Amino acid sequence: MKQYLDLLQHVMENGSDRGDRTGTGTRSVFGYQMRFDLAQGFPVLTTKKLHLRSIIHELLWFLKGDTNIAYLKENGVSIWDEWADENGDLGPVYGAQWRSWPKPGGGHIDQIANLVESIKTNPNSRRHIVSAWNPAEVDEMALPPCHCLFQFYVADGKLSCQLYQRSADIFLGVPFNIASYALLTMMVAQVTGLKAGDFIHTLGDAHLYANHFEQARLQLTRQPKPLPVMRINPDVKDVFGFAFEDFSLENYSADPVIKAPIAV
């Protein structure tokens, strides 16, 4: 995807070298935006192969409201292993905030259920928002949410999504985030009777770790291929009713994986 390669090149050429929490060092810019028309294909990288299984299972895990890595491990997904405690728990991370945001007087708010209902009943609303950033619980999370707030927008029979990501690990994290939220947009569009529009990805601190520079340079030598098509089982009408088998990526051709270390 040219949009992603443009981001890589922009940060490599214009970013500021800074320290960071992990001690690895980064090159970063503050404030960057990419836009993907989902009618033009599914926005998954073709200049390095991505593990789509991990992306789909992680999204389904979020939608379950789950915060223990047991489901992920059962399905061969290890992307959260470094942050889990000895029992596999992560604290009140994404799934908890999406599905059971605690109310001050007791009880919980299911933001995803409310979102879907709001899109169906009041599509022109400017309040189609889900937040994972809960200041009261951030300190209890194994990792505070990087992709922390998203908003949906309905126009001309199409559903678009804008994500704000406060912290963006460009080489390892951002490709997963693009595909994940593009897929979420398609799923929500299907269950609300709409077509998928655009996915807009807004980044706050967009950074390349110093030990990813060589990998980024290699990726920039590769040419993007045509985007694949994501097929979703049309019979699923409940956003919580999707299973892994309901998704099929067709015509995905990608360059080999480029390995890079995770900064924890």
From Swiss-Prot:
GO terms for cellular component: cytosol. Pathway: Pyrimidine metabolism; dTTP biosynthesis. The keyword Methyltransferase applies. Its main location: cytoplasm. Homodimer. This is Thymidylate synthase. Keywords: Cytoplasm, Methyltransferase, Nucleotide biosynthesis, Transferase. It catalyses: dUMP + (6R)-5,10-methylene-5,6,7,8-tetrahydrofolate = 7,8-dihydrofolate + dTMP. One of its GO terms (molecular function) is thymidylate synthase activity. (6R)-5,10-methylene-5,6,7,8-tetrahydrofolate binds at H51, D169, A263. Catalyzes the reductive methylation of 2'-deoxyuridine-5'-monophosphate (dUMP) to 2'-deoxythymidine-5'-monophosphate (dTMP) while utilizing 5,10-methylenetetrahydrofolate (mTHF) as the methyl donor and reductant in the reaction, yielding dihydrofolate (DHF) as a by-product. This enzymatic reaction provides an intracellular de novo source of dTMP, an essential precursor for DNA biosynthesis. The active site is at C146 (nucleophile). DUMP binds at R21, R126, R127, R166, S167, A168, D169, N177, H207, L208, Y209. It is found in: Cytoplasm. Gene3D superfamilies: Thymidylate synthase/dCMP hydroxymethylase domain. Its EC number is 2.1.1.45. GO terms for biological process: dTMP biosynthetic process; dTTP biosynthetic process; methylation.
